[in-house]
């Protein structure tokens, strides 16, 4: 369970601010703190916004005067792991790297380069760029063994495909040669740092593919973290990739109850992208309860269970899915109201017809009583699969999480 600082700070932070955030991460039970964009760049190219410094991967002496090793150890003092953001394939024109090597970017000759998020893409067909990008990774991680997580980002796509390195007759090779070089870099990263967990990130699932999957532990499915959007995104995503690769984070995006944002995120690799110091005490308590619930009861089912699609969000105002443990002893069931309306009963799947299961609604705020008639009761697997669970939800943004445990 990770906490990302981006929503809290963007590029504006220092060591004291990060320590405050570490304290917040510890208080809600997060296991890892991810230091996002903004930790690098110096002088006129300090990474104080997204227009400067990309490509200059020396830690900011202004923000982190004691270096990465110090700030990682400060997280560990609080029993919180430490991860870091990298975007090794990119460069800002406002950077020392670009001033030295303007020919390293992908562009077409005699055309003004087009920027995306104020940045260009480095040409990985060039051997010197391949060496440079490995050096970024190596010099960030090898001297700092306390960094145990990497978010590898990619914030723009290729336009004006052209290489000043490739011969004119080979320009059409750029797409393939780039990707092979990228896979080699990813392979070297995974083998060089086998104890570092990594998420591959790009908006809109732009970096989700089976070729990269051997080198990463999870993917970022979309920058759309509105729960209503994520329900359909994760429904589709999980047709092709397992749930343990779906990074699902609680954010402020969308009109929704915090409970719904939490319940949707609980169906994937759970994380938090919130400014906890700006949250109310009630919201922080809600997050802490969700983290505890996920770590203790839900995570094993999501990470290793079998997925059953119960009600499609494309066919009903309700979306429902479940994960069932391989031994059929436990299951977690999710209910999400994407619109007003009622799906009267939900038939479960994957249970042992002969086992008896106790139903318990979890992810409830303190003092709130379950509305599910089945809550606290025991049913056979056959009953739950043939007759189903009565569903009391009928209003948009309502959600519920139920856990089933077989009575031995």
What are these regions (language model features)?
Residues 2-135, 144, 148-149:
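Aromatic-lined carbohydrate-binding/catalytic grooves of carbohydrate-active enzymes
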Residues 3, 33, 75, 198, ...:
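Conserved, mostly hydrophobic/aromatic
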Residues 38-40, 101, 155-158, 167, ...:
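Active/binding-pocket-proximal capping segment
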Residues 92, 98-131, 135, 176-278:
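Glycan-recognition surfaces
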Residues 148-159, 200-208:
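Short acidic/histidine-rich active-site segments
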Residues 262-311:
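Catalytic cores of secreted or luminal carbohydrate-active enzymes
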Residues 313-354:
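Carbohydrate-binding surface patches
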Residues 339-408:
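C-terminal beta-sandwich/jelly-roll accessory domains of carbohydrate-active enzymes
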């Amino acid at each position: 369970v990770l906490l990302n600082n981006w929503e809290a700070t963007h590029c504006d932070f220092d060591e004291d601010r990060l320590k405050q955030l570490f304290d917040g991460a510890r208080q809600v039970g997060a296991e890892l703190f991810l230091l996002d964009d903004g930790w690098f760049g110096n002088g006129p190219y300090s990474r104080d916004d997204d227009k400067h410094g990309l490509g200059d991967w020396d830690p900011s002496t202004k923000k982190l005067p004691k270096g990465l090793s110090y700030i990682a150890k400060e997280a560990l003092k609080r029993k919180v792991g430490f991860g870091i953001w990298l975007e090794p394939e990119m460069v800002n024109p406002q950077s020392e790297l670009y001033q030295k090597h303007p020919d390293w970017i992908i562009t077409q000759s005699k055309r003004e380069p087009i920027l995306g998020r104020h940045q260009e893409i480095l040409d990985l067909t060039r051997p010197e760029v391949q060496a440079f990008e490995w050096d970024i990774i190596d010099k960030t991680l090898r001297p700092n063994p306390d960094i145990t997580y990497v978010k590898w980002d990619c914030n723009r796509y290729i336009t004006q495909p052209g290489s000043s390195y490739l011969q004119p007759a080979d320009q059409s090779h750029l797409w393939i040669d780039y990707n092979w070089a990228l896979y080699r870099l990813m392979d070297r990263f995974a083998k060089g740092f086998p104890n570092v967990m990594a998420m591959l990130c790009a908006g809109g699932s732009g970096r989700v593919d089976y070729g990269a999957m051997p080198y990463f532990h999870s993917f970022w499915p979309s920058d759309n973290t509105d729960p209503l959007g994520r329900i359909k995104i994760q429904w589709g995503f999980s047709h092709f990739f397992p749930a343990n690769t779906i990074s699902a984070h609680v954010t402020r995006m969308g009109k929704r109850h915090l409970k719904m944002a939490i319940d949707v995120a609980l169906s994937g690799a759970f994380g938090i992208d919130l400014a906890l110091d700006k949250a109310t005490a009630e919201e922080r308590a809600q997050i802490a309860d969700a983290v505890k619930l996920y770590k203790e009861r839900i995570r094993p089912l999501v990470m290793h269970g079998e997925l059953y699609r119960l009600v499609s969000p494309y066919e009903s105002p309700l979306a429902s899915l479940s994960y069932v443990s391989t031994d059929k002893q436990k299951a977690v069931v999710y209910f999400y109201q994407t619109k007003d309306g009622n799906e009267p009963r939900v038939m479960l799947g994957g249970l042992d017809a002969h086992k008896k299961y106790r139903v318990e609604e979890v992810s409830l705020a303190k003092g709130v009583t379950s509305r599910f008639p089945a809550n606290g009761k025991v049913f056979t697997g056959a009953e739950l699969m043939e007759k189903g669970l009565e569903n009391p939800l009928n209003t948009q943004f309502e959600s519920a999480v139920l856990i089933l445990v077989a009575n031995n």
